[in-house]
UniProtKB/Swiss-Prot annotation:
One of its GO terms (cellular component) is respiratory chain complex I. It holds the Pfam family Oxidored_q2. It is a multi-pass membrane protein. Core subunit of the mitochondrial membrane respiratory chain NADH dehydrogenase (Complex I) which catalyzes electron transfer from NADH through the respiratory chain, using ubiquinone as an electron acceptor. Part of the enzyme membrane arm which is embedded in the lipid bilayer and involved in proton translocation. Its EC number is 7.1.1.2. It comes from Myxine glutinosa. This is NADH-ubiquinone oxidoreductase chain 4L. It is an enzyme of class 7 (translocase). Gene3D superfamilies: 1.10.287.3510. Belongs to the complex I subunit 4L family. It catalyses: a ubiquinone + NADH + 5 H(+)(in) = a ubiquinol + NAD(+) + 4 H(+)(out). It is found in: Mitochondrion membrane.
Length: 96
């Protein structure tokens, strides 16, 4: 596949992150889409270069993506239990 495809998918996920800010779940899905496109781009670019220093980079990126997904799930469950919804409007800094 062409690396331009993954760059375009990253930009689409970034625009989704900018425009769909009502629910926390939609924000986390856009972040996961961005992480997936970066992972695919890193995997393709490391296969093109064939350097030993770039081979573990997609695996490291995948590890960070899994950690991000776990943390986002914990945040979503915690917010749903405390606020009874996942709306971003219910989050303010003054409630802390």
């Amino acid at each position: 596949m062409n690396p331009t495809t993954f760059i375009i998918s990253f930009m689409i996920a970034l625009s989704g992150l900018a425009f769909y800010q009502t629910h926390l779940l939609s924000l986390f899905l856009c972040l996961e889409g961005m992480a997936l496109s970066v992972f695919c781009l890193m995997a393709i670019s490391s296969s093109y270069t064939l350097s030993l220093s770039t081979i573990p980079l997609p695996l490291i990126m995948l590890t960070f993506s899994v950690c991000e997904a776990g943390l986002s799930l914990v945040l979503l469950v915690t917010m749903t239990r405390t606020h009874q919804n996942d709306l971003m409007s219910s989050l303010t800094l003054l409630k802390c």
